[in-house]
UniProtKB/Swiss-Prot annotation:
Native source organism of the sequence: Streptomyces griseus
Lineage top rank: taxon: Bacteria
Listed name of the protein: Glycerol operon regulatory protein
UniProt cross-references to InterPro entries, sorted A to Z: GAF-like_dom_sf, HTH_MetabolicPath_Reg, Tscrpt_reg_IclR_C, Tscrpt_reg_IclR_N, WH-like_DNA-bd_sf, WH_DNA-bd_sf
Keywords (A to Z) from UniProt: Activator, DNA-binding, Glycerol metabolism, Transcription, Transcription regulation
Amino acid sequence: MARNIQSLERAAAMLRLLAGGERRLGLSDIASTLGLAKGTAHGILRSLQAEGFVEQEPASGRYQLGAELLALGNSYLDVHELRARALVWTDDLARSSGEAAYLGVLHQQGVLIVHHVFRPDDSRQVLEVGAMHPLHSTAHGKVISAFDPVAHSEVLEGDRATLTGRTVTEAAAFEEVLDLTRARGWALDLEETWEGVASLAAPVHDRRRMAVGAVGVTGPVERLCPDGAPATELVTAVRDCAAAVSRDLGAGRF
């Protein structure tokens, strides 16, 4: 069994200590409460301070939680609220389309799958929650890249690897794909990530009307795009699902 890293355990203990009780604590209070030497406690606090997890009040020298923790906490809450709001609608999408439905968000130059509804049949399927999908080739990734400025920068600066013979990798051509995605409000992956697989996705917006993720379906290309393009009914179903989740997040009418 792997041993825990002591310095990380101590840093976590400090953050928990600062999160409870008094808002600001001095070095002596922190060291004595955690049973640490002052030098050890000070070194850990300085590292946490450098990362923005801890702030030191100039006048008193006392420590408190930093703004970076709030940002991390908000990111956690945003993703979990998004998933909670999408549960019913993605279930409906999978049922109406007969295909697997996915909800994805931007994470580390890729698409993190945060919710996955199995295709409603008896076939063997693997849960993909937690999986990372490419940002430049998947329908979810294109949608996020088209509507999220951060993702747009990430995908242009990152490696757009050739995954199949259909993958668009050249910058100008990729920008045209994103322009088309913005114009019609959805994106298509037609065997650009996996041979024989197609996907269709639309953006999800929050109360600030910012793109916070993408929802869509994935399945065999012969079912999703039998004539080289998705059926109008499928596009409508995906866009309606994204609009419903967006409304539940406070985005208003889409």
